[in-house]
Regions:
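Exposed extracellular interaction/assembly regions and N-terminal maturation sites
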Residues: 1-54, 79-89
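Short, surface-exposed, polar/charged, turn-prone segments marking secondary-structure boundaries
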Residues: 46-48, 66-70
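Terminal beta-strand-rich extracellular "head" domains
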Residues: 55-68
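Extracellular disulfide-bonded cysteine-rich modules/repeats
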Residues: 70-80
Length: 89
């Protein structure tokens, strides 16, 4: 499922590819834990803060309640009870 997002919202368990096209700052809530689920993303302009659940900024990182995305493409994967962030350069 592909989704363009321009306002604050919640992601769904069927969101697989997300492009953030907002111009201002938005807050996006992750779906409930679904082990193995991966959400690919691309941030185009405005600020994006991911919230909800237990978030790790990288494998082995310290748990956070939110993470601010940079402009790189990446993905966030549900691994057990955590959403783990990976960037693709």
């Amino acid at each position: 499922n592909w989704r363009n997002i321009s306002v604050s919202t919640s992601l769904n368990n069927n969101d697989d590819n997300v492009m953030f096209i907002n111009t201002g700052n938005i807050e996006v809530t992750l779906p409930p834990d679904v082990p193995g689920h991966t959400i690919y993303f691309k941030r185009m302009s405005g600020g994006v803060r991911l919230t909800g659940g237990r978030i790790l900024p990288a494998p082995g990182g310290q748990e956070m309640s939110y993470i601010d995305l940079d402009f790189a493409s990446g993905f966030i994967k549900c691994m057990g009870n955590y959403w783990v962030m990976f960037y693709c350069g």
